[in-house]
Amino acid sequence: MNDGYVKTDPWRLVEDRFDPSRTLSSESLFALGNGVMGGRANFEERYSGETLQGNYIGGVYYPDKTRVGWWKNGYPEYFAKVPNAAFWIGVDVAVDGEPLDLATVAEVKSFYRETDMRRSVLTRRMRVVLKNGVEVAVETVRFLSLARRELGVVKYAVTPLNRAARITFSPHVDADVRNADANYDEKFWEEVSTEADATQSRTKKSGFEAAWAQAVELDGAEWHCETRPEKVRATAAVSREKGCAAVLYKYAGICSSLNHAPADLIAAARAVAASGQEAGFEALLEEQTAAWAARWHGCDIEIGGDARAQQGIRFCIFMLLQTYTGVDTRLNIGPKGFTGEKYGGVTYWDTEAYCLPFYLATAGRAVARELLVYRYNQLDKAIENAAKLGFRDGAALYPMVTVNGEECHNEWEITFEEIHRNGAVAYAIFNYIRYTGDTAYLADCGLEVLLSVARFWAQRITWSGARQKYVMLGVTGPNEYENNVDNNWYTSYIACWSMRYAAESAAWVRENRPADYARICAKRRFDETAETKRWLEIADGMYFGEDRELGIFLQQDGYLDKEQTLAKDLDPADRPINQRWSWDRILRSCLIKQADVLQGLYFFGDDFDLDTVRRNFRFYEARTVHESSLSPCVHAILAARIGDLDKAYELYLRTVRLDLDDYNREVREGCHVTSMAGSWLSVVEGFGGMRVRDGVLSFDPQLPAAWESLSFKVNFRDRVLTVRITRNAVEVANEGAPVELEIRGVRRLIADKVIMNCEL
């Protein structure tokens, strides 16, 4: 764990010493992004110590050939990965001929690095003594422009402190890069062309192209340009007296074939770099500050009295804002965002289950709708994916892992069996419409997805003569510490719900949008009468395991046959168990990776009374090791709902500081960005008690003991609501048309520009 290594501050991430053993972790935590590209917090100058260079362009992928021990029919041929792109931030430095390299300097006298989360600016300040005895102060400032999404900016200042010195700068772009996670150690890029100030590359197989150009400034410099394959470098040396800084400015244009013709890429990148140079560093920084202020305006959360909780939630929101802006339907939210290579930068069910509610409430319906359209645009691929596994008649199975709609995951127990992801796609449509009231989406796109998903479920079930019930065999639920089980409760429940919702939606479209209904029936060969009858018959006849004595739903058949070990009784040396135990031992244990039954009780909370939720929570949370980043948030929300605020707060801190404190000892691989949306849910739905019932936004707030107050904003049906909660009252300010709200069970109408106070 990080043990306080990252200092607590409400708006900044700060490390105040240089620890080479934490370099990889800090590269993840201090990563930057602007929604279309991003990168790890690598040092600009050469660093010969342990590092994972990482710069990524959203939407660009490489089909890395699948690597498995035993090929099974139906496996995907490749895993689509976001390739590590050119190292555009590079600025090598030498002082009186001695290279600056933190791994080899004589002494690091001081080191300070911060990310200013208000404006997504990374600053580093250090004093070092080089091997030749020269002591220098170094300050770097870096950001990816939110206002100009193809521009990266670096300021690099070196000041000799104990004598005059000659300082050599070599700003460069290096496109000769590899992915650490390449299955066969292949390079994903090949050179197209390299010129004095720019280089262009193409991804092998997938054919995406990108270009990087740099424009540089340094007072008194005469530049010498060096061009080698895939590398652009400019070098200049300047003399500075003791105490006088040499300041380099670097403006990088980063353009891809997603937005430009390949033949125009170098010209486009040069134009971006030149326009940045013309604007100048200070003006660009002002633009950045203003653009980020606008982003924060609708989504900041303020927590009174708890600095660690405050920093944690802002860090989570910040990473989400850096990762996705909703400007492009081709983009989505990878589990690591732009912070690392793990999971390939691709889309999982995390987007629908966790991220959509955050963007719904903070960015508005248009941005959230883009996430749904992303899946709609990939529906035909989902139908192809299902057909490869033997399903027919337009049944769709959305991939577990994807960039372009094709399945990329190559573990059979996940690819073939973790089919609950289909339910998450359907639930996201329901959640979007419930929150926005945008029923038109059903006719525009949603019904086609819903009926295709329902067709899959109708074919995936089996009739059990012994039970006289429909059963769901051979699945993996959200708890991935169980594979190939029968009758996973969550999978069966969301399957039944999906079929019912598809039938309900078909009726709505038929009655309200008859022309669209006819179009959909023809396009998808949909026979509503026959198909919905079958769906409802299955939903009404599904088997669900339960233990009446314990009063719980059974996670799957045979779960109570396992030795009932509690998570609290594990030896700390065995944690996390996925890094300590054999997979055989994990599968035979009762220990749970993340919410499974409880995921269903969270999604469908209105279907169950609090006593049912409480019994299941007490039983399953005690057996949960929370070794998925997606786990603590769901448990925190449910704990708050049943009134266990101490447990809710404990789990909230775990989810919100999962990466800052490195609970699972893996932040070096990248941050858990999609689960950060769950951290937001923990605050707003957990302690804020926000839910939507019958089209009405309701709040049932409860503050943990450590908090004095909680404030947040939500965009609900084009009204921006500011909610402030204290021990004794709730205050809601409305910016927009009058809106009906429910607070602690009492409904009230709030007019525009009105602040309503309610005692608790």
Residue spans for each PLM region:
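Active-site core of glycosidic bond-cleaving carbohydrate-active enzymes
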Residues: 347-353, 357-376, 500, 507, ...
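Beta-sandwich/jelly-roll carbohydrate-recognition scaffolds of carbohydrate-active enzymes
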Residues: 2-311, 321
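C-terminal capping/lid segments that line or modulate ligand- or cofactor-binding pockets
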Residues: 24-57, 61, 354, 404-405, ...
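Helix-terminus loop motifs that line ligand-binding clefts
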Residues: 324-339, 365-427, 433, 440-444, ...
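Non-catalytic C-terminal accessory modules of carbohydrate-active enzymes
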Residues: 77-131, 610-614, 621-622, 629, ...
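The feature captures the catalytic groove of carbohydrate-active enzymes
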Residues: 339-347, 396-435, 439-444, 455-534, ...
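Structured secondary-structure scaffolds
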Residues: 295-370, 534-538, 545, 564, ...
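Structural helix-adjacent loops and short alpha-helical linkers that scaffold large soluble proteins
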Residues: 303-310, 326-328, 361-372, 433-448, ...
